[in-house]
Each structure stands twice: as C-alpha cells, then as structure tokens.
C-alpha cells in the first residue's frame, strides 16, 4: 500500500500503461451517471484549469473538450479522485445531452437479465 498516495493530501494520479485514468461523470444535482471517459495528465490539468471537462479520446488520439463541437460542455462543480488515485469522479453541470446520440446519459439502456438484450430505459 502506498500510504502517501492513498491517505495523503497530494494529487498524484496513478496513470495506467497508456498514461490514462478512468473518469466518471455525474450530474451534480441528480447524481445520475452521465458518461465514462479517460483522462491523461494534460486533460486533467486542462479540466482543473478551465473548469470544463476535457478528456483524452482514445479513438481520436488527442485531447477532447466535451462539447467542443456540440456546445454541450460539462461545467465541473467538483472533482474527486478515488483512494488509490486511478479514477476521477467529475460532478458536473451539463449544458445539454452527455451522449453523442442525443440522450441525456450515455447509460440510457439497461441489460435485460432474462436474455442478452438491451432495453431502452424510460426517464421518470
């Protein structure tokens, strides 16, 4: 156990072999999970400096500011890191849908336990 990393007060992310940490984004009001993405050191620094969520796109191989083309930015209300500093939690105020499909959350389908099918969820 790396006690300084796990219990200390210094931000010292534990990046994986690709230089990334997982980032979970939730709505700061409802707590709903909006999306999951990845951040490298540059994306984390840009997020903390600007107050708007920036990620590293594995498919594009570059930084990606959420909403850069759609306008659906994620204003960061609070950023947290887990106990061993390999995952980031961003509590955000979304300016629009989080998902590229237009859905509020990227997690808009549930997996039916009775078979390998996806069922669209209905917001209450």
Curated annotation (Swiss-Prot):
Binding site residues for Zn(2+): 83, 99, 106
Enzyme Commission no: 3.5.4.19
Signal sequence, renumbered to the chain: none
Highest taxon of the lineage: Bacteria
Cofactor: Mg(2+); Zn(2+)
Known pathway: Amino-acid biosynthesis; L-histidine biosynthesis; L-histidine from 5-phospho-alpha-D-ribose 1-diphosphate: step 3/9
GO BP term, example: L-histidine biosynthetic process
One GO cellular component term noted in the UniProt record for this chain: cytoplasm
GO terms of molecular function: magnesium ion binding; phosphoribosyl-AMP cyclohydrolase activity; zinc ion binding
Record-linked SUPFAM superfamilies: HisI-like
Principal location listed in the UniProt entry: cytoplasm
Catalytic activity: 1-(5-phospho-beta-D-ribosyl)-5'-AMP + H2O = 1-(5-phospho-beta-D-ribosyl)-5-[(5-phospho-beta-D-ribosylamino)methylideneamino]imidazole-4-carboxamide
Binding site for Mg(2+): 82, 84, 86
Cellular localization per UniProt: Cytoplasm
Cofactor note: Binds 1 Mg(2+) ion per subunit. Binds 1 zinc ion per subunit.
Keywords on record: Amino-acid biosynthesis, Cytoplasm, Histidine biosynthesis, Hydrolase, Magnesium, Metal-binding, Zinc
Stated role: Catalyzes the hydrolysis of the adenine ring of phosphoribosyl-AMP.
NCBIfam families listed in its UniProt record: PRK00051.1
Subunit structure, as described in the record: Homodimer.
Assigned protein family: Belongs to the PRA-CH family.
Xref: PANTHER family: HISTIDINE BIOSYNTHESIS BIFUNCTIONAL PROTEIN, HISTIDINE BIOSYNTHESIS BIFUNCTIONAL PROTEIN HIS7
Protein name: Phosphoribosyl-AMP cyclohydrolase
Species for this entry: Rhizorhabdus wittichii (strain DSM 6014 / CCUG 31198 / JCM 15750 / NBRC 105917 / EY 4224 / RW1) (Sphingomonas wittichii)
Gene name of the record: hisI
């Amino acid at each position: 156990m790396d006690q300084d990393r796990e219990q200390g007060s210094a931000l010292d992310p534990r990046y994986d072999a690709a230089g990334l940490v997982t980032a979970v984004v939730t709505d700061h009001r409802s707590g709903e999970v909006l999306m999951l993405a990845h951040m490298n050191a540059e994306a984390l620094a840009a997020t903390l400096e600007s107050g708007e969520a920036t990620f590293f796109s594995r498919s594009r191989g570059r930084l990606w500011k959420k909403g850069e083309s759609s306008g659906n930015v994620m204003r960061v209300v609070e950023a947290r890191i887990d106990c061993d500093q390999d995952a980031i939690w961003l509590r955000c105020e979304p300016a629009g849908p989080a998902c590229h499909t237009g859905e509020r959350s990227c997690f808009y389908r549930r997996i039916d336990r009775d078979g390998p099918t996806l069922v669209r969820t209905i917001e209450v």
